[in-house]
Amino acid sequence: MWSKRIRYLNFLILFLTANVSAEYKITVLATNISNYGGFGEWSFSALYESDEESVLFDTGFHEDTVLHNAKILNKDLSKVNKVVLSHFHSDHTGGLIKLRQVYKELNADAFSEVYVARGFFDQRYYKDGSMEGPGNYRDSSEFKKAAEEEGIKFIILDDFKKISNNLYATGTVERVVEKYNGPKGFYLDKDLTIPDIIRDDQSVGMLTDNGWIMMSGCGHSGIINTAMKLQSIKNEPVYGAIGGFHLFKASDNTSLK
């Protein structure tokens, strides 16, 4: 049973830092709860740190949130060269360009290598016909242009990719158990005939001696589907999950399953 294989780790306080393996230290830099002078918002960002390198997963909503929270936690983000974005939504991509602008002055490669899943740059439309794109941009192509002008290179993934030692981006997640987990009313065409199922939703898996620890931005691909994708990379148990699961409207019965 999947319910026996995944232990949900609930983060109730911003800046909860966990040593979940000897290799990486994880620090949550943005979520909807704040404490001790930090900024809280509807968003997500987390930092992986090892002796070898630092990797950022998602960049928060407002451009200054991750910058501020990292500063008060004494986290040196100038060491971050690689970023994994879970999906295009602005509450996960809003800080990227500002982070690059600030830290490239200290490290020319800072925030320059960004991994996204196929479909990230698809143009989206609200049900009223207005456009929606990444990073607080309405037009996806404008976001891409602005980021690339700052020296950011996007690596588009169709399948999983090893980002660092024992750290993997899932790339595209096959929708096996659940086809879509997320908001409705968004489309991929101006005529509003093709519903957006956020095919670019991906997660990060960290391989430890005990198995996989999964980090999800929103879980639009479905948490079980994502766990299955990690096990297709290496058949180890998924014993921990961190981040957003988009289960806030789910019944208790659904959440427990």
Question: Which residues does each PLM region occupy?
Answer:
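Acidic/polar short surface loop at catalytic or gating sites that assists cofactor/ion binding
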Residues: 112, 116-151, 171, 175-186
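N-terminal signal peptide c-region/cleavage motif recognized by signal peptidases
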Residues: 17-18
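Bacterial N-terminal signal peptides that target proteins for export
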Residues: 1-10
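Charged helix-capping and loop-helix junction motifs
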Residues: 253-257
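Conserved beta-strand hairpin/beta-sheet module of binuclear metal-dependent hydrolase folds
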Residues: 24-73, 197-215
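Active-site metal-binding motif and surrounding structural segment of the metallo-beta-lactamase
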Residues: 64-116, 231-242
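Active-site-proximal loop/helix segment associated with metal-binding centers of metalloenzymes
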Residues: 132-138, 162-209
